[in-house]
């Protein structure tokens, strides 16, 4: 989307493209080219694929383009030798409304934090990460069901148009930059968008239903939130990736407990795992929000046919799109057809809540 919109203008010439090196992937380790490279080759545009951005040979080839302006979209951090090279400077497209969500994963974190609004920003690159002067911003709404993948697809055409507007504004000298702090309103707290980690992806079922629901959306389709399942009788944990789920709260949650034969009077106890970090689904913790039943977060609820849910601090998440390690990704009904006796499995303690809390300090 970006390349097609940018290359179609007659007001300037695209003299070269810098993209990632070709990498082998898949079972056959077939070498795959980036979409940017394929498009550039098809349109007879020179392509550079450096391994190191400070490589003298690469810097010479880049300088030989004699470009007036560099445009950066979804690339790595540039050394000053690169971004300071063109006379009109270098600008970047960031998938958030800067100064909010500076960092490597702004789309994911906007969804993880349950934002209702995101957007794209063009800004001049300087010595620090995502701090340069802002030129243009464009908002985009996030729906209650949007995943990170959905938001990415919404932002793509908006970002492409914003890049073209920015290029034309710079060339025609009718665009201004504003310092990022001028966009901060009152006591507004800046939120960060750090790199996604395995610890973030491992769901902590002691968190709230809404928080876990947003985490699943924000990590879908990649890298995907996950939990680990362990046979109640003992054995090695098996990873279960979760691409989509639905919140189960209030009366709907109480109805699910009845369907699963879980009623009042279950013994209550503190929310601890055993020494191996496995939630004991037979121990049940009284949690506010679990009205009418004392239930421990991380317990599996399923009828074995149509639904597979895992309890949270105040409800449950009904899993709808999931993938067991070594198996295909599938919807819940075909999953349950091959996953026998779900109630005989336990979940392990996750780490997502701690990782989310780190970004809010």
Regions found by a protein language model. Give the residues of each.
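Internal anion-binding site segments
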Residues: 186-270, 274-361
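N-terminal glycine-/serine-/threonine-rich beta1-alpha1-beta2 phosphate-ribose binding loop
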Residues: 20-68
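Short, structured coil segments at secondary-structure junctions
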Residues: 10, 43, 85-86
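Donor/substrate-binding cores of folate-linked one-carbon enzymes
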Residues: 3, 20, 67-199
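N-terminal Rossmann-like dinucleotide-binding module
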Residues: 3-28
